[in-house]
């Protein structure tokens, strides 16, 4: 569903158009933006710029602060790891948001993901599962991030460990993630994540440095 914002002149703009002008800081549009955040959670879509605009409006209008929307924005940021969206959102939080117990729980979950302690993350996620059950695709988004880390860390990995890192998934679900990432089986208990050909190859980089760039420095050394 398209979200339209009504301007003072009676005309309507899309959210993207509104975010490109000074109207993004108009508190009259906050309810529309909050509804847009809820739609992102429901429909498994994501709009970082709009979500950050909501947090910025909370900064300007603390009396309009909505904690449930804050939780949803932070959790949606987690679904876009390894990008730094969560850090940007966290920097916009008000002191009263930072002191909130649920916000602290989400920050803890983010820290756990950042240090790649995925087993602990899934344990904590199970304890706090009601917090993000309204966010469609949350678990698979985290598994996508886990797959990214596994792909940059391992050449081969045991199936049981991979299942654990992906949240204790069933064999059939594991097969889907193996195919999705282009991984291959090796024997009965190993998964090949990267072959020898997949390794990063060294590359010679030549940079042209003009004399004018170092002339002043050389003169100081004489």
Curated annotation (Swiss-Prot):
Name the UniProt record assigns to this protein: Eukaryotic translation initiation factor 3 subunit K
Query: Which family does the UniProt entry place this protein in?
Result: Belongs to the eIF-3 subunit K family.
Q: Where are the transmembrane segments?
A: none
In which domain of life is the source organism classified? Eukaryota
Query: Which species expresses this protein natively?
Result: Drosophila virilis
List, alphabetically, the InterPro entries matched: ARM-type_fold, CSN8_PSD8_EIF3K, eIF3k, PCI_dom, Transl_init_fac_sub12_N_euk, WH-like_DNA-bd_sf, WH_DNA-bd_sf
Q: What does this protein do?
A: Component of the eukaryotic translation initiation factor 3 (eIF-3) complex, which is involved in protein synthesis of a specialized repertoire of mRNAs and, together with other initiation factors, stimulates binding of mRNA and methionyl-tRNAi to the 40S ribosome. The eIF-3 complex specifically targets and initiates translation of a subset of mRNAs involved in cell proliferation.
Q: What assembly does the database describe for this protein?
A: Component of the eukaryotic translation initiation factor 3 (eIF-3) complex. The eIF-3 complex interacts with pix.
GO CC annotation terms, alphabetical:
eukaryotic 43S preinitiation complex; eukaryotic 48S preinitiation complex; eukaryotic translation initiation factor 3 complex
The GO annotation for biological process reads:
formation of cytoplasmic translation initiation complex; regulation of translational initiation
